């Protein structure tokens, strides 16, 4: 494969796991836009910067030289030489990342970082196939009911299912402006499917 594949979807739709597996099968790097937004949220929390302070947050990100290391097996985010990756999937980051991702300046900053990576690659996020890589050769949008997505996330986090579902519904409401399928994307409800089945479905469409 020599082009770009985009895999978009709401939170906990399985897009990250699918994108990693698809990238590995194709032998190309995997790009996670969400990891950059999470890094911005984490750094804002750690530095005491208001997540809604666009100017202050951009100054922080540029000053730390935040960058994404794209690899087929997963991504890492570095800031001033420090690997932040293990700090980015926490309930605290979950609760502020949507506010950070709504800032136009931060979205532009993330998009610049992503566009620095030469194709081929598999990119996952919420608007990869619409705002970032509209020229992608293959576009997919994965979704599932809020209940299914909350159940998946609760298995990964030390949180009760009910709390995860509440957080997820709030995030869906905040993210709905950014999270919509491209007109030419293939849409798949993954609720009744295994990871292997979703990966096989995506690969089958790419290899047609």
UniProtKB/Swiss-Prot annotation:
What's the domain of life for this entry?
Bacteria
Enzyme Commission designation: 2.7.4.25
Annotated residues that bind ATP are located at: 9-17
Q: Which terms under GO biological process does the entry name?
A: pyrimidine nucleotide metabolic process
Main location class: cytoplasm
Provide a GO CC annotation, any one. Answer: cytoplasm
A Pfam short name:
Cytidylate_kin
Show the catalytic activity.
CMP + ATP = CDP + ADP; dCMP + ATP = dCDP + ADP
Instruction: Supply one GO molecular-function term.
Output: CMP kinase activity
Statement: the UniProt record of this protein carries the keyword Membrane: no
Subcellular location(s) of the protein? Cytoplasm
User: Top EC class per UniProt?
Assistant: transferase
Alphabetically list the UniProt keywords: ATP-binding, Cytoplasm, Kinase, Nucleotide-binding, Transferase
The UniProt similarity line reads: Belongs to the cytidylate kinase family. Type 1 subfamily.
HAMAP family xrefs: Cytidyl_kinase_type1
Give the protein name, as stated in the record: Cytidylate kinase
Q: Which organism is it from?
A: Thermus thermophilus (strain ATCC 27634 / DSM 579 / HB8)
- Gene symbol of the encoding locus: cmk
